[in-house]
Structures are given as structure tokens and as C-alpha cells.
């Protein structure tokens, strides 16, 4: 369904945040017979609904809001409306067409778009793709799940988008290049279960992309894709890391060396995988990555990564403090821990308890010497899950500040103190940025507290 298909139809936009506002303005320009906005959220009218918005669509809520949704031919929901919302279940049961602004936008721009999703790595990989394309004279607009609704993006010849599972769920068109970086259980409460989450995530691939690029090292992706044609980055026949001309690890395309691994400033094998995916996408777009290897190496060297993703904080003690607050699942925390293999690590875990299974984390740490500090709410359950592992020291502390203080006492001077919570921030913190701020402040405030 395209925006132009809404001409002459009754349309309800569900959500009054940035996505809903962008949808109202875009849809109003295409002449719907009737347009209304509905908001059932707790922060109803947190932003004023006035001017062109109010002229284009009245805003309603409560029971009247549901009645207006049910009376519409098409409902355009914001990504924040979960699949499990009882209103959404009822609307679909009544046969109401439900879509999103991202789906309407994609229908008109799919052939010019690289779409990147993944349970982890989508932000870094999409940023890398956009950054590297610019370095080889391929201008692009970067957007998606980074605060700017797709319907607000300027016109461009090429788009690179980071797409959440919520944004992927209602797509009826796949982008020209569809990319998946990783697949593991996440956001199960919003999607209704693990299978439903995978279905919504992989809907990005379901509508005829020209090329699919995936992380070939991800076992769940491999199982879900089966024998479907795809570029499996990390495999020997495509972009991968292997010994180079000087015997050190290099990035390669097939048997052709590109540049040393040391050029990439990001730590961790998972970030090697992210760059392999990004380079494979450039090749799929027709970039001669071998001929442009020098320019790409310079661009890679200048890529400093994104905030709150293995962001190191300077400390006079010799300890390396690392903010990885966006690691909200056990699998993400496992990647972060692996990034500092060979060094003593104290990892701080815990946050909002969504009932995730932490058994994979226990299995991952079974042979590793590591200190684990659990903070509320899920930290106590994580520590209990790790009980009995012979090389794991695990204890519960009162809060994040206490965890930083305790980490200074337990971690050797050349060690790493890693905030990789394996859980979301809500409940104890306003958002993930607030959790990051509290961590950084605790690091500063305890700087006079000697390491072990």
C-alpha cells in the first residue's frame, strides 16, 4: 500500500508522537476522505496538537479513540503500538487494514533503499554502510530507527535505514538490499513470543529484495534462511577476516586482501562481523571494494562507533570502564564480554526483568574466569542462574553506583569493568541514556577508590 492509495479513504493514525505526526502530515497531502489521530498512551498530549496537525486531523482518545480506529478503512499505527495490544488484536479480527508509516514510505522508495535490521548490530552496521558509501562517492541519506520518521526523510537517490522489528512487521515491500545482522530472542512481550518476533524481524526479507546480506556466522539466521539465496558475510567466498600479506588478520573479499583488521577501531569479533556485512552491502551495490580498498581503509579508521556501545571511559586507576548500556539481552552481553577476552573482566548485569532465559549466558561463561555483579531487578536472578560455575564470582549489589564501587574493589588494575546489563533500563532509570549517565557519574565519583 502506497500513500497515494489512501486518497478518498477513511484513515486513522494511531499514535501522536513523532511517527504519528509525520504520518498525519504525509497522509493529509494525499486527500483522504477522513483523517483522525488517536492516542491511547500514558503521555497523552505530552506535545501540543495544534496548527497544521489539528487542521489535518482531530485528536481523540479513550473509548472514542477505539471507535474511530474501528470505523476506519485503514489504520496507520506508530511502531510503538505492540502487536499484543488488545485494540490491535480486535481491529485485525474485524478485518481492518493496519499498516505503518514505514510501510507506506517503503512502498515508494524500496528500490533506492538499503534496509538493516538485527537483534544486535543494526545501528553500527547501518552507520558503517552509510559512512563507507559516502567515502566512495555514493551520497546517501541515513535514517530509520534513529529518531527521524521515514516519512520525514528528504528525497535522495539512495537511503540507508536502520529498521527495528516493529518497523519491519507491517512492510509489504522489501528494500533493494535487505540486511540482517543477528537474530536472537528480544522484545518478546511486544511481539507475542519468539516465533512472532522472528517472523516480524524477517518480514524485511519477505517481499522480493534484490539482494539479501546476512551475518553468515549467526546460527539462528542460518536456520531461518535455510537454503534461501543470500550473501553470507564472514564466509570465505565473500567478505571475511583471515591472515593477510603480513600474517596478521586482514579483511578480505574472497581471496583478495583489503586492509588490516587493526584499521578498525572497534573492539570485538562481532564488530568484525558488522564490518564484513557492511562491505558485502557495498559490493552488492556495485562498489568495487578491492579497487577502493585504500579509501575504505581510511574511512574505517575514522569510524569511532556509536555511543553506549562498548564506549570506553578513561580512568586514572588503569581500569578500563566500558559503557555498553544498550546490551539489553544475554546474547548482547555475551558479545561484549567476548570483546575483552584475555583481560580480567567484571561485568555489571541487571535491569528490568522481562523473564528472559539466562541459561545461554550461564553456558557461555561455564569455562570463563569472570566477576559478575547483579543489580536490580533481574540481577539477582542472573546471579542465581550462574551459581555453581567454578570460575565465576557472582554477587548481588544494591544498585549501579554500588556496583561500580564494588567493581573497583574486585577488578585487577589492568582489568575491565563492563556495564553490559543484559536487560532494559526502564523502571530504575528514565531511559538507557539515564543509566549511562549514572554509570559515568559513578565512575567519576569513585575515581579515588583504589583498584585491587
From Swiss-Prot:
Molecular function terms in GO for this entry?
A: ATP binding; UDP-N-acetylmuramoylalanine-D-glutamate ligase activity
Biological or metabolic pathway of the protein: Cell wall biogenesis; peptidoglycan biosynthesis
Name the SUPFAM superfamilies on file. Answer: MurCD N-terminal domain, MurD-like peptide ligases, catalytic domain, MurD-like peptide ligases, peptide-binding domain
Q: Where in the cell is it found?
A: Cytoplasm
Query: Cross-referenced InterPro entries, in alphabetical order?
Result: Mur-like_cat_sf (IPR036565), Mur_ligase_C_dom_sf (IPR036615), Mur_ligase_cen (IPR013221), MurD (IPR005762), MurD2 (IPR043687)
Q: Which UniProt keywords apply?
A: ATP-binding, Cell cycle, Cell division, Cell shape, Cell wall biogenesis/degradation, Cytoplasm, Ligase, Nucleotide-binding, Peptidoglycan synthesis
Family annotation (Pfam families): Mur_ligase_M
- What's an example GO cellular component term for this entry? cytoplasm
Record EC number = 6.3.2.53
Q: Biological process (GO) annotations?
A: cell division; cell wall organization; peptidoglycan biosynthetic process; regulation of cell shape
Q: What is the recorded function of this protein according to its Swiss-Prot or TrEMBL entry?
A: Cell wall formation. Catalyzes the addition of L-glutamate to the nucleotide precursor UDP-N-acetylmuramoyl-L-alanine.
Similarity annotation: Belongs to the MurCDEF family. MurD2 subfamily.
Q: What is this protein called?
A: UDP-N-acetylmuramoyl-L-alanine--L-glutamate ligase
Name the gene: murD2
Amino acid at each position: 500500500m502506497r500513500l497515494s492509495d489512501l486518497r478518498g479513504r477513511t484513515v486513522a493514525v494511531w499514535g501522536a508522537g513523532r511517527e504519528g505526526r509525520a504520518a498525519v502530515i504525509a497522509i493529509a497531502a494525499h486527500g483522504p476522505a477522513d483523517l483522525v489521530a488517536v492516542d491511547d498512551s500514558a503521555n497523552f498530549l505530552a506535545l501540543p496538537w495544534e496548527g497544521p496537525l489539528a487542521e489535518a486531523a482531530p485528536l481523540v482518545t479513550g473509548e472514542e479513540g477505539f471507535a474511530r480506529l474501528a470505523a476506519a478503512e485503514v489504520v496507520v499505527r506508530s511502531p510503538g503500538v505492540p502487536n499484543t495490544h488488545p485494540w490491535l488484536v480486535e481491529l485485525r479480527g474485524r478485518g481492518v487494514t493496519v499498516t505503518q508509516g514505514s510501510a507506506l514510505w517503503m512502498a515508494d522508495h524500496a528500490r533506492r533503499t538499503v534496509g538493516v535490521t538485527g537483534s544486535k548490530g543494526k545501528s553500527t552496521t547501518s552507520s558503517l554502510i552509510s559512512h563507507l558509501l559516502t567515502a566512495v562517492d555514493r551520497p546517501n541519506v541515513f535514517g530509520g530507527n534513529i529518531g527521524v520518521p521515514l516519512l520525514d526523510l528528504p528525497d535522495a537517490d539512495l537511503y540507508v535505514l536502520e529498521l527495528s522489528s516493529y518497523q519491519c512487521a507491517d512492510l509489504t515491500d522489501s528494500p533493494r538490499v535487505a540486511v540482517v545482522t543477528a537474530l536472537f530472542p528480544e522484545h518478546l512481550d511486544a511481539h507475542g513470543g519468539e516465533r512472532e518476533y522472528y517472523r516480524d524481524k524477517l518480514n524485511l526479507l519477505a517481499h522480493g529484495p534484490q539482494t539479501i546480506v546476512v551475518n553468515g556466522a549467526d546460527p539462528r539466521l542460518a536456520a531461518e534462511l535455510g537454503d534461501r539465496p543470500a550473501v553470507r558475510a564472514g564466509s570465505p567466498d565473500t567478505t571475511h577476516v583471515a591472515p593477510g600479506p603480513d600474517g596478521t588478520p586482514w579483511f578480505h573479499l574472497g581471496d583478495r586482501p583489503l586492509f588490516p583488521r587493526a584499521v578498525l577501531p572497534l573492539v570485538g569479533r562481532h564488530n568484525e562481523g558488522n564490518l564484513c556485512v557492511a562491505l558485502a552491502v557495498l559490493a552488492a551495490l556495485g562498489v568495487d571494494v578491492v579497487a577502493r580498498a585504500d579509501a575504505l581503509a581510511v574511512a574505517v579508521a575514522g569510524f569511532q562507533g556509536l555511543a553506549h556501545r562498548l564506549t570506553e571511559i578513561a580512568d586514572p586507576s588503569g581500569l578500563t570502564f566500558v559503557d555498553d548500556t544498550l546490551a539489553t539481552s544475554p546474547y548482547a552481553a555475551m558479545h561484549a564480554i567476548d570483546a575483552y577476552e584475555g583481560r580480567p573482566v567484571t561485568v555489571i548485569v541487571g535491569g528490568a526483568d522481562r523473564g528472559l532465559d539466562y541459561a545461554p549466558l550461564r553456558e557461555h561463561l561455564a569455562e570463563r574466569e569472570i566477576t559478575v555483579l547483579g543489580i536490580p531487578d533481574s540481577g539477582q536472578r542472573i546471579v542465581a542462574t550462574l551459581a555453581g560455575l567454578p570460575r565465576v564470582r557472582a554477587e548481588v549489589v544494591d544498585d549501579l553506583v554500588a556496583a561500580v564501587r564494588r567493581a573497583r574493589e574486585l577488578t585487577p588494575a589492568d582489568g575491565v569493568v563492563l556495564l553490559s546489563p543484559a536487560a532494559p533500563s526502564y523502571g530504575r532509570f528514565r531511559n538507557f541514556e539515564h543509566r549511562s549517565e549514572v554509570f559515568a557519574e559513578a565512575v567519576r565519583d569513585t575515581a579515588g577508590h583504589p583498584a585491587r
